[in-house]
Amino acid sequence: WLAHPELSRESEKNVSGNYGTLDQIAALKWVKDNIANFGGDPNNITIFGESAGGQAVTSLMISPLSKGLFHKAIAQSGTGLPNVLTDIREDKGLLVSAESKGIKLAKYFLGENANINDLRELPALKIVSIDDFQLDQDLIMMTNQIVDGYVFPESIKDAFINQNVHDLPFMVGFNGDEGTSLFPLIIDPKTFSLFGEFWPESLWAFVN
């Protein structure tokens, strides 16, 4: 989901990023065109995802490019709410735009004068070898869907509020202990003991 001003200028839509979602949409098109050859029904396709996959399913529910490619959806432990989708160009308070993050990423690897051609020359091994870098406070926000006016005209939250969602059966829910491996403090008994009998209210306020 890397966006960058130079990538946007190369696009006839004047946008960049969301390549992961576009790959998912291309895969759904292939399934719809070919599933009958495997005994499936192209008019009864269900998509399902858990955690990041649940977020992907929820985002596909609002993309106009995925309309008609599936008929039912299941999302577990991943809604994409409230601010997973980043605006492509506009910085909003602490939420840095996708293109700004792309520029920071280029500078991180290649210095102040880095351009998109330099980035294309980077070995893949070098990129994946620094999975612990943080250009912003929240690393998760570096690799998520982008409100670009094309793949995603608006955020997931706004799309559901405005009812700009595919009209089809949609099952949502959460699995027990989802995400606790990423946030061990939440399930550490010492954390509960700090708050005494008020731990439910206090912990809820803390994690929010």
Model-predicted regions and their roles:
Residues 72, 85-87, 118-208:
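Substrate-gating cap/lid region and adjacent catalytic-acid/histidine neighborhood
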Residues 1-113, 150, 159-186:
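Serine-hydrolase-like catalytic core of hydrolytic proteins
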